[in-house]
């Protein structure tokens, strides 16, 4: 099991991540996003739009405030899109999304 918060910080520092539900939707529609993560308090209509994209989607188990803090930001983040993971392990979440046990 990866440390999601640490992987997020690493991805933001060494890769390319866009914050916010609108930007995440936009990059998901364009096909740029490799992974989308949304907070537990992300509005349901936004979650439905994100899940309808052909991009893996991960439900962060805490609030937007906590997701923002995990990203090193002083504000809530409802959703984010990983465009380039950089040196992080964030893409290991794909195994969880697909239901494959981590080794």
Curated annotation (Swiss-Prot):
Biological process (GO), any one: translation
Gene3D superfamilies: 3.30.1330.30
InterPro entries: Ribosomal_eL30, Ribosomal_eL30-like, Ribosomal_eL30-like_sf, Ribosomal_eL30_CS, Ribosomal_eL8/eL30/eS12/Gad45
Keywords for the protein's UniProt record, in alphabetical order: Ribonucleoprotein, Ribosomal protein
Gene Ontology cellular component annotations, sorted alphabetically: cytosolic large ribosomal subunit
HAMAP family tied to this protein: Ribosomal_eL30 (MF_00481)
Protein family: Belongs to the eukaryotic ribosomal protein eL30 family.
Name of the featured protein: Large ribosomal subunit protein eL30
Organism of provenance: Methanothrix thermoacetophila (strain DSM 6194 / JCM 14653 / NBRC 101360 / PT) (Methanosaeta thermophila)
